[in-house]
Amino acid sequence: VAELKTKETEASVEEFLRGVADESVRADCRKIAGMMSKATNEEPKMWGESIVGFGKRHLKYASGRELDWMKIGFSPRKQNITLYLSTGEAWDDELLSKLGKHKTGMGCLYIKRLSDVDEKVLQKLIEKSAAEAEGS
C-alpha cells in the first residue's frame, strides 16, 4: 500500500502564508483561514508543503484503505485558491448557484479571489462542509 505523502506537519502556517507572493492572494488566504477556523473551532496546521488544513478525521474506503485527513482546508495554487471541502454525497447546488465565479472538482472548490464570490455564501459552504466532516 502506497504511503500517503500529504500528512499533517509541524511547519508554520504563518511562515507558509508569508511566502505567498501575491499580496491579494495572501490576504484572501488569511481571510479563508479565519473562516475555516471559525467553522471548525480548530487552529490551522500545515498538511504537506502547501495545504493549510483544519481538524483531522479518519477515513475508511470501501477498498479497505484507511488514512487520516484534514476536515477542511485550502491551498493557494498558481491558477487559483483551492478549497478542500467535505461534500458528502454531492455539492449543495443551491448554495453554489449563489456563490459567484468558481469551479468545482472532487471535493474541491476553486476560486481566483474572494472578491469573485459572495463571502457569506462561502462561509455557509465552509460551515456545511465542516459539519459534514465532523459526522464522517
Regions found by a protein language model. Name each.
Residues V1-S136:
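Charge-dense, helix-prone N-terminal extensions
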